[in-house]
Every structure is written in C-alpha cells, then in structure tokens.
C-alpha cells in the first residue's frame, strides 16, 4: 500500500491545476462557453455588380514565383479571409466567390507589410464587396476561427505547422465577419457570389478545397440565432 508523502504537491491533473503554477502559461480571458451569432435571411441582402477584379498573378506558377521573390524581401506572406454567413430556411450558408465553374474562394487577400489583421481584412472586404455609392460598409470582425500555414512554395496548406518546418511561406487566418441585418454588396463582374449550405461544404474537399470544406467544423462552436 503506497502512502503519499505529506509534502507532495497536490497540483496537476486531474485536479485541474497546472504543475507549473501558471509560471509558463499566459493568463487568458475567461472561457466563453457559448458564443451567439445572429444570422439573417439571404433575401435581406442586395447584390449589385462592379468592374472586374483580377488576380495579381496570371497563373499558379506566377503566384508562387512572386511569393518566392517577396519572401526573400519581406518574409512570410500574411493572408486573411472573411467568412460571411446567412441563412435560408434556418440552414447556415457561407457566401463564396465563384470564378469560372469549379473555383471557389473566401473574400480576402494579402496583408501589406506591418498591416493590422482586422483592419487589413476590412480593407480587402471593401475592395472586393464594398458598394460604390460612397457608403462605407460596417464590417464587424470579432472572431478568428482558423489558422492555416503553407510550408513551401507549393499548393498544400495545413491547419498546423509541420514539425520539420521552421520558416512557413504563408500564414492564412480565417475570421468570422458578422453581417448587419441588411446590406448591399457590389460583386466584381468576373465573379459570382454564391451561398453554399454547410451540408454541401462538409467533407467536400474535392469540390471546395480543404479550407472551405473545414468550415462546418470550425463554425460548430457558435450558437446561431436565426432572425
């Protein structure tokens, strides 16, 4: 029969107290057990058009060549993308930009060197979907819902940094953008803005890629209110 010495530490698992006494663990905000997000019907939103918005690079090869050149000058590329959600018949739908027949992307893009992530995403959202009558869109961005890294100058991205990678080439952050009850969006003519239901995205990497198809899991922590 073993006896616990009287001076033995009573901290650590399973009592919920870290054995390090919080010496190496940064204090965080109190855990939010339920995060509520208001969703509004797709019919509440008006979609106009504006001049085409073209990619900086003419091909995938050109994109990685530019990434390589910029990495040598300014380091890792920082990218932000916005997740906009509406509902139809009380089913959440994510707004996606469609280019051609098979390519889908979230609105967003590259940050400028030193640019704040949230302010940069607001700038990009305005460039891509902002209205043209001079009325500024109020983008509400409170939640980062995902991080993806590109370890090499190649297409694969991962929701973690592989163990052997010390200098990722790109860091992509996904943010939930909370929409107002009503809004007007101006969509570049070379894109379509489509509302894809979560059940279509789920486990559908062949159709939407690994990042967009992971959104149902990332969004499952929210409590949606269907207005």
Swiss-Prot record:
GO cellular component, one term: cytoplasm
Superkingdom per UniProt: Eukaryota
InterPro entries found in the cross-reference section: Cleav_polyA_spec_factor_su5, NUDIX_hydrolase-like_dom_sf, NUDIX_hydrolase_dom
Tissue expression per record: Expressed in the heart, brain, placenta, lung, liver, skeletal muscle, kidney and pancreas.
Residues bearing the modification Omega-N-methylarginine: 15
Stretches the record annotates as Interaction with RNA: 102-104
Modified sites of kind N-acetylserine: 2
RNA-binding recorded as keyword: yes
GO molecular function, one term: protein homodimerization activity
Keywords (A to Z) from UniProt: Acetylation, Cytoplasm, Differentiation, Methylation, mRNA processing, Nucleus, Phosphoprotein, RNA-binding
Region (Necessary for interactions with PAPOLA and PABPN1) location: 81-160
Site feature location: Interaction with RNA: 55, 63
Annotated Nudix hydrolase domain residues: 76-201
Function: Component of the cleavage factor Im (CFIm) complex that functions as an activator of the pre-mRNA 3'-end cleavage and polyadenylation processing required for the maturation of pre-mRNA into functional mRNAs. CFIm contributes to the recruitment of multiprotein complexes on specific sequences on the pre-mRNA 3'-end, so called cleavage and polyadenylation signals (pA signals). Most pre-mRNAs contain multiple pA signals, resulting in alternative cleavage and polyadenylation (APA) producing mRNAs with variable 3'-end formation.
UniProt protein name: Cleavage and polyadenylation specificity factor subunit 5
Gene: NUDT21
């Amino acid at each position: 029969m073993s006896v616990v010495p009287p001076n033995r530490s009573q901290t650590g698992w399973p009592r919920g107290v870290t054995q390090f006494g919080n010496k190496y663990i940064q204090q965080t905000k109190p855990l939010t057990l339920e995060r509520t997000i208001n969703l509004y019907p797709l019919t509440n939103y008006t979609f106009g058009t504006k001049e085409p918005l073209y990619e900086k690079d003419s091909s995938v090869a050109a994109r990685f060549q530019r990434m390589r050149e910029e990495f040598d000058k300014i380091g890792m590329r920082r990218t932000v993308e916005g997740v906009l959600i509406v509902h139809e018949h009380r089913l959440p739908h994510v707004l996606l930009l469609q280019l051609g027949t098979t390519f889908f992307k979230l609105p967003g893009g590259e940050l400028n060197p030193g640019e704040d992530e949230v302010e940069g995403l607001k700038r990009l959202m305005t460039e891509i979907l902002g209205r043209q009558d001079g009325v500024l869109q109020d983008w509400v961005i409170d939640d980062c819902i995902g991080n993806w890294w590109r370890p090499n100058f190649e297409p694969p991205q991962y929701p973690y940094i592989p163990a052997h990678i010390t200098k990722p080439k790109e860091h992509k952050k996904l943010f939930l953008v909370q929409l107002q009850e009503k809004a007007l969006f101006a969509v570049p003519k070379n894109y379509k803005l489509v509302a894809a239901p979560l059940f279509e995205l789920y486990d559908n990497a062949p159709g939407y890629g690994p990042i967009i198809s992971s959104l149902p899991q990332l969004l499952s922590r929210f409590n949606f209110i269907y207005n």
